[in-house]
């Protein structure tokens, strides 16, 4: 970088009224100055960013409860809870065929740390104390190994297919995640099929959204750009190019904290292939009217799919029963951030999505942000919110999908969704609830196959033994005790 381009970067920030960033610039060493300029150079148009943030603050103060929401049309939805075995078999075979032909990749969101779990380690390293003591990463890696094997058997192929696993980390989790995989020999996967990349960051601002905060005299405060930053990260890190060069057509994306996730689920992939969807999402049935979850719905005003937050629907609509079945809520499709994308669709849409706030607006979160006090030059940790962090939401692009190209598959929560979010002691989503749900699912599979578990105990079906309850005929008539691993 030349001195001239350094000056251009400084000027671009000063023109955006960010003079405060350079308050200590002249006192820095040449190396520190260079480091600072390198960091600032990642922000392409400071003036545009500031104006966008100010707009986002105004937008966050408007209310969306006036919009009209309803269920998605039947043609766009299905439920594994009441589908015929023939349809499930057909979708499974379509999915296995795509996997067997090397057309499926998996995209994992693994940027989070286990802060609420009392750990600074990446969440995927967490051990929920199963009898096998396996981490979330290991369980998921072994699901990939198992589904590769099942696809090979289905196609009667001599060669095992490869599912590429793209893992999005964040600055704080990248090194620890890679080290964990190396230490564990990639859990039996080939190191070449595991590709790590980082999500982006965005600057942190004061509460008015017009000044970027300094973390030190030569660095600004930054935070991860939210799960909606995935799309830009796919482009910026060459992942989209890699998918295309490998002939990958279908992507299954999920979050690391779901201990029951069916990684590269052939039913879900087959559902999307059969119906020619560009984008599809898995949902579980909302527990009750007051469960604080986002919902997949149809915006009646523009006839587009979208996600609405719990706070965006009226109490009356939240409690409304389905006219077709009064035992169910009318709006019940709880978002679990588990999506299918066609690569062709991503190629077409990612450049649009990442170039406009129309598709991926900034959402504002007021936070306590440790930063530099410009009055005395000292670093401080505030006790009250002193600034805002920006994030983008992955589902904000849903309305850009043609309704007939958007799918929504309801699955059984007990089989497919148990997230790890809180430390033990909380009501839900703890290591204990995750462990219990995992073992209850395993035990159900064993009993369905004629196995006997003594004294109502719970057993663990190893993730390499069975992907989704198949292949367990050998347990018929056998007795197992609490804590056994099968």
From Swiss-Prot:
Coiled coil: none annotated. Its EC number is 2.7.7.23. CDD domains: UDPGlcNAc_PPase. This is UDP-N-acetylglucosamine pyrophosphorylase. InterPro entries: Nucleotide-diphossugar_trans, UDP-sugar_pyrophosphorylase, UDPGP_fam. GO terms for biological process: UDP-N-acetylglucosamine biosynthetic process. It catalyses: N-acetyl-alpha-D-glucosamine 1-phosphate + UTP + H(+) = UDP-N-acetyl-alpha-D-glucosamine + diphosphate. Substrate binds at residues 227, 421. The gene is UAP1. The keyword Nucleotidyltransferase applies. PANTHER family: LD24639P, UDP- GLUCOSE PYROPHOSPHORYLASE. Pathway: Nucleotide-sugar biosynthesis; UDP-N-acetyl-alpha-D-glucosamine biosynthesis; UDP-N-acetyl-alpha-D-glucosamine from N-acetyl-alpha-D-glucosamine 1-phosphate: step 1/1. GO terms for molecular function: UDP-N-acetylglucosamine diphosphorylase activity. A motif (Substrate binding) lies at residues 109-112, 309-310. GO terms for cellular component: cytoplasm. It comes from the Eukaryota. Belongs to the UDPGP type 1 family. It is found in: Cytoplasm. It comes from Candida albicans (Yeast). Keywords: Cytoplasm, Nucleotidyltransferase, Transferase.
